[in-house]
Amino acid sequence: MMGICEMKSCCSWLLLISLLCSLSNESQAISPDGEALLSFRNAVTRSDSFIHQWRPEDPDPCNWNGVTCDAKTKRVITLNLTYHKIMGPLPPDIGKLDHLRLLMLHNNALYGAIPTALGNCTALEEIHLQSNYFTGPIPAEMGDLPGLQKLDMSSNTLSGPIPASLGQLKKLSNFNVSNNFLVGQIPSDGVLSGFSKNSFIGNLNLCGKHVDVVCQDDSGNPSSHSQSGQNQKKNSGKLLISASATVGALLLVALMCFWGCFLYKKLGKVEIKSLAKDVGGGASIVMFHGDLPYSSKDIIKKLEMLNEEHIIGCGGFGTVYKLAMDDGKVFALKRILKLNEGFDRFFERELEILGSIKHRYLVNLRGYCNSPTSKLLLYDYLPGGSLDEALHERGEQLDWDSRVNIIIGAAKGLSYLHHDCSPRIIHRDIKSSNILLDGNLEARVSDFGLAKLLEDEESHITTIVAGTFGYLAPEYMQSGRATEKTDVYSFGVLVLEVLSGKRPTDASFIEKGLNVVGWLKFLISEKRPRDIVDPNCEGMQMESLDALLSIATQCVSPSPEERPTMHRVVQLLESEVMTPCPSEFYDSSSD
């Protein structure tokens, strides 16, 4: 009898323990929000380590990187994963985050369609998907988000029309679909009618009053929905380059370029023959907004006639040729070898955007030739060559006024990229060989956008390979992440190069274990900063020099926060260098 009781007691304890274990396991089960986030993580093919911390072993997603939860409900309300090199599709399970208010996935490498399930996240107030590679149509279901206030899908490869349902978003105050492949008439009803042209530019096949393009019906006549009496216009709005992280391998391109230059020097006409064969093997010409008044046949014929005498340079992005047309106009042709066919679509899209950017102090991209193995970029040809050549390779010396004007021109070009483009453009490779000069020695910034286009995952390494080591900001060397302030640092180095007439890593600096920035700091400590100036520079004005040294010193500050913006730099140049007042820089350095 006692045995039976003991058995019953034992079974009761086992049942209780089993129940407690079951309850314990249930309490540790991951939440539905966590499961949705893990679905997203599992879809990612590549990223930095930011979301590696998301693990099913940690059942509380509120502790995960980039995730914020409501304190009471413990539901996910914010997902912020910007600038983390995330590559992969956005899975439909994202729609299960029905308490989500803020979705920030911009500046990554997400691709594929935007899931229609996003329309299930009815608590959303802000969606930021810009600067990715999303394709396909904009889901009409996004019009089912009653609380949505901000929607940014700019700088992707979205196609199709803009859904009319978005006009129902009564709280929408910020809307941007610029720089995509959207087509058709922009909905004129509802909230979308209140947004400006900047929300839609960069979509060449959109029409409507927002972009000053009259819509046509199927017969080719102006649509009855368009304003009467308005002539059809081409969309002349500026296409703005994305800060999107395009796939590329600058290291590979640089090595190919150097190898191409080696072949040119050692094997003579081998590269030229391959270029002629490449162009003759099925090339097509893309012109931007009628900038090239020539037929494709005429241009290809000229390309086939290029020989080794037309090579005028070989840099980090490719070999450069001088191309003369029959009407006397001259262009610079930059040859960039293709990386892979999948890269073409994004590359061509970015080239189209670059080709639309026009400014007095920028080198214009007129079009390109798409050949089987390379892209041939057609730029304006500037007879003055590069600033690097003017400073270091020619017999004649630049006088003071010329140097100051070059500095101001370069500053204005870079300031335009930083402050007058949306999204802002980071050059990433400011150096003297990327500052070109016209016949009057007026400066123009070249190669903007290419460093980002061909960016390798280890971008700081590829830039060093390209020969710009002396221009890199210290934080860029450490992190590889470029910002406007890394450009400002490079500009400060450029100013010192122009003033000294020496390259940033001149042998005279290296012997002392310094570069031009270190040399300036040494001279300041010795209370003789003016000694940095090229002794062969004629017409120097001391007050302007002191102002320039002060600006350069601010630009090359070790702390990015202490560097001025390029807009501020231009203001200082115009107020203190062009019309100098007595400077305190030299006095403060001489105390």
Swiss-Prot record:
Annotated positions of the Phosphotyrosine modification: Y476
PTM comment, free text: Autophosphorylated.
Record-annotated membrane-spanning stretches: 239-259
Species whose genome carries this gene: Arabidopsis thaliana (Mouse-ear cress)
Residues noted as binding ATP in the record, renumbered to the chain: I312, G313, C314, G315, G316, F317, G318, T319, V320, K334
PANTHER family tied to this protein: LRR RECEPTOR-LIKE SERINE/THREONINE-PROTEIN KINASE-RELATED (PTHR48056), PROTEIN KINASE DOMAIN-CONTAINING PROTEIN (PTHR48056:SF77)
Protein name from the UniProt record: LRR receptor-like serine/threonine-protein kinase FEI 1
A Pfam family matched in the record: Pkinase
Cytoplasmic side: 260-591
Positions annotated as glycosylated: N80, N120, N176
Job description of the protein: Involved in the signaling pathway that regulates cell wall function, including cellulose biosynthesis, likely via an 1-aminocyclopropane-1-carboxylic acid (ACC)-mediated signal (a precursor of ethylene).
InterPro entries recorded: Kinase-like_dom_sf (IPR011009), Leu-rich_rpt (IPR001611), LRR_dom_sf (IPR032675), LRR_N_plant-typ (IPR013210), Plant_LRR-RLKs (IPR050647), Prot_kinase_dom (IPR000719), Protein_kinase_ATP_BS (IPR017441), Ser/Thr_kinase_AS (IPR008271)
Membrane association type: Single-pass type I membrane protein
Keyword Cell membrane: yes
UniProt keywords, alphabetically: ATP-binding, Cell membrane, Glycoprotein, Kinase, Leucine-rich repeat, Membrane, Nucleotide-binding, Phosphoprotein, Receptor, Repeat, Serine/threonine-protein kinase, Signal, Transferase, Transmembrane, Transmembrane helix
Main location: membrane
Gene3D superfamilies cross-referenced by the UniProt entry: Phosphorylase Kinase, domain 1 (3.30.200.20), Ribonuclease Inhibitor (3.80.10.10), Transferase(Phosphotransferase) domain 1 (1.10.510.10)
Coiled coil: none
